[in-house]
């Protein structure tokens, strides 16, 4: 943690696909970028929620997984040497007398740039954990909040909780490899898209 600010051309809040592509576009203009993201790796929801799930709505890509998309974007921006500030959030933003912006992260890093890009998508990914005593004992053993490797669920009996797009997408994606899937949902109808 340093109070001395790091000066750059552009600060991007969010290291998902839009933030990564912003690095590419800025790089073409000769701008240096620093990215801030709450997660421990670039990729946003693509790597956090569906790294192995096919995505069908990326221009020029008939089908690509979330991880493949992020890997390709990281290759595309590597010549521009972006600096990542991971596992932290943008905490404060202040306009300076020189008309630059000063952003402080949750870890106390101070960045300064004339350009701020907010590419935060749906915001930082924080799972909605049920209020259940000692739940953390089972996390990463038998409770997962995201699917990172589908092969982990091969021939397993699974319980998926939720009624939104993500829950139903994972039921459909895991159905061919799981032994059994039970979907638990507390409402009468589903919130997912048709």
PLM region descriptions:
Residues 1-13, 28, 41, 84-156:
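FAD-binding core/adjacent interface of flavoenzyme oxidoreductases
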Residues 2-7, 11-40, 142-191:
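Rossmann-like dinucleotide/flavin-binding elements
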Residues 21-25, 76, 112:
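Residues within well-formed alpha-helices
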Residues 23-25, 47-48, 128-132, 171-173:
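Short amphipathic alpha-helical segments
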Residues 71, 75, 88, 141-145, ...:
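Short, contiguous clusters of charged residues that form electrostatic/catalytic patches at enzyme active sites
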Residues 3, 47-110, 190-194:
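N-terminal Rossmann-like dinucleotide/flavin-binding domain of flavoprotein oxidoreductases
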Residues 29-30, 51-53, 132-136, 176-178:
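Glycine-rich, phosphate-binding/catalytic loops in enzymes
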């Amino acid at each position: 943690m340093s109070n001395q600010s790091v000066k750059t051309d552009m600060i991007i809040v969010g290291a998902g696909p839009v933030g990564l592509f912003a690095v590419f576009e800025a790089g073409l203009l000769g701008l240096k970028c620093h990215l801030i993201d709450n997660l421990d790796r670039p990729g946003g929801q693509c790597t956090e929620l569906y790294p192995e799930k096919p995505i069908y709505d990326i221009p020029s890509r008939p089908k690509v997984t979330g991880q493949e998309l992020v890997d390709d974007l990281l290759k595309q921006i590597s010549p521009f040497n972006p600096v990542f500030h991971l596992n932290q959030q943008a905490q404060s933003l202040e306009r300076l007398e020189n008309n630059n912006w000063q952003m402080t992260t949750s870890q106390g890093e101070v960045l300064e740039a004339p350009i701020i890009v907010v590419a935060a998508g749906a915001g930082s990914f924080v799972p909605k954990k049920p209020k259940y005593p000692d739940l953390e004992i089972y996390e990463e053993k038998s409770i997962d909040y995201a699917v990172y490797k589908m092969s982990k669920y091969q021939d397993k009996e699974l319980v998926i909780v939720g009624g939104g797009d993500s829950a139903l997408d994972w039921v459909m994606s895991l159905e061919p490899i799981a032994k059994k899937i039970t979907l638990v949902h507390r409402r009468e109808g589903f919130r997912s898209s048709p």
